[in-house]
Amino acid sequence: MVKAWKEKVVIPTYEVGKPEKNPIFLEKRVYQGSSGVVYPYPVIESMSDEKVDKEYNAIFIENEYIKVMILPELGGRVQMAYDKIRERHFIYYNHVIKPALVGLAGPWISGGIEFNWPQHHRPSTYMPVDTTIEENADGSVTVWVNEMERMFHQKGMAGFTLRPGHAFLEIKGVLYNRTEVPQTFLWWANPAVAVNDYYQSVFPPDINAVFDHGKRAVSSFPIATGTYYKMDYSAGVDISNYKNIKVPTSYMAVNSRFNFEGGYENDTRAGMLHVANHHISPGKKQWTWGNGDFGRAWDRNLTDEDGPYIELMAGVYTENQPDFTWLQPYEEKSFVQYFLPYRELGVVKNASRDLLMNIEPEGEDSVRFKIFATSCQTVNVVLKGEDGKIYYSKEVTITPEELLDETVNVNGEKLDKLILEITANGRELLYWHAEPEEVKPIPDAAEAALLPEEIKTTEQLYLTGLHLEQYRHATYNPVEYYEEALRRDPIDVRNNNALGLWYIRKGRFHKAEQYLLTAVKTLQKRNPNPYDGEPIYNLGLALKYQRRYNEAYDRFYKSCWNAAWQDAGYFACAQISTMQSRLEDALDEIDRSLIRNWHNHKARALKTAILRRMGRTEEALQLIEDSLAIDKFNFGCRYEKYLITNVVDELSVMKEMMRGEPHNYDEIALDYCAAGCWQEAASLWNIAIAEGIVTPMTYYYLGWCLHQGGLSGVKQAFADAVKACPDYCFPK
């Protein structure tokens, strides 16, 4: 049985200081290898030395094997994860909240599992998030946390699920680009584990090298033999063992075909493992403050009594820091990660979410293998040689309480000539064969980008500029690379498109238009129906933001001749059609958009508004239910449900989930404005005002909205904006 509940907990806490009320831009700060800009988030620069008991609104989730505590007020982090069989915390449990100035916006705490997105360390790691609890049909329970972040206007969710009879924590990540332009992100789940001289990181056996941040340095692994972090490892040092790393050190694995990473306590014979699909989760990282005086000083900075830890980070759609991936307009990416406790196995050789195994030589003639299961499973286990000779074949039942531990005489056969297979009903569940004994080449460290004038081709100028944008480089300016390319070839399509999109992001729409017109003219010189529709779509954006809607509409529609832009292009058309009260056209266009991207959550909300305006309320309500089944934090759909039903309880649920956060109201109201739904937007901001959920921007947005919609109350809204406290907003 799985249960979840909300509970107030008291945790000794060192309070943080007040955020700086005026913006700190930090536009040239280098942070974790990329830009340290945090605007519009406020920055906190002080911590208290005094500890107080502080109450937090925790959410617990528990089954027969695992108990987890989540703190929505601190970024939705996993604060505690407890193994009920072994009676131990399999994730480092810091009994105090003791922040240090490590985070992107200031405060950061050690322990638990932190989720770093859209960059590292997460800007909102010490801020509240939205939450809800979902009970699933199979008896599992999911605790969802959600955030619409302020820097790039992306949306991220994490769902923490426990299933009956399963000894793992399942985490589903769902990332969504709410904007009309491409955005970049990374996702690093950051579990901490308690360490001592007996602790060993468990990386897959095919990893022979590790990189530093930005791939600026490289080391062999697990035995380091050169200089890494200015430490001389020439004697050959096993850096998978915590005790051997004396200085602060990061390392990130180079390429693995395995789905796991973790760590093992050789003294207590217990460990933690992360499992995820390596095709989308290649990131495997260890970080330590170091087993030395500096590291112990940081232990004291971050905890009172819980001692040293390391971080065993797991990256999805990323393999390094920084290493960003693109999210196209309105694109959603989702994935699943598993964190689980295990025991007795030692250094895992292969693992899935269901089964873990290890095999080692035992004396001269035998081997010993152990298999751990995360649920009760009846499986067939076969140990054989490469020549097909069977040494062991048995159907066995394995449970989380009792692992399989067998010693088998293999007549002295070498370990690397053996194969272990675990199957059920003819389906392979887990397979092991030793890695070939070969010396793999160590990859080269990354090189700094050349200056624009040093690059030979316009193609490389474009790719370098795009890389700088993608990785949010703090000091190199991508514009210089695009401009150098255009100095050499003024009508180059890619560089004109890149500069046009750059200026759209900067709000310089007329300047963007000039570059995009050049790109489109070149693109269509010989062919009015080009292979790539992105410059045409971007030109539509530049025109739309200049309120030249008919011209924009034509461009958006033309971009939809290319399949890649039908999602965003038809959605943009539907917004303009709604704005112009052409609802039949809008409905057709929004349906075409949704055919290309079923998880365009903004399109779903707009379609409900269109159906409501057309009087097709039953269809709208059904779409709302379908949409909320996909994303319970689709606040646009929730507000539409209230507008259709006029049921106050529906509004109350929405307000509770939005937790009094002005940014949530702004985002949804601005979605309405983008489609000319001025009355709906104004009504939503008026709800926020009535609840006292305001910043000066609430009133400025409202005044602008009322003016655009030809509605009354414009002067009063702007008067209220002027009187509102500008702290943490700085709207002027």
Walk through the language-model features, giving the residues of each:
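A contiguous, surface-exposed recognition patch within enzymatic or periplasmic domains that forms
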Residues: V2-K3, E7-P23, I59, M69, ...
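Extended, loop-rich substrate-binding clefts of extracytoplasmic carbohydrate-active enzymes
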Residues: I24-K54, A58-E62, I109-F168, R296-T325, ...
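Residue-level recognition of tetratricopeptide repeat
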Residues: L466-H467, L501, L541, Q575, ...
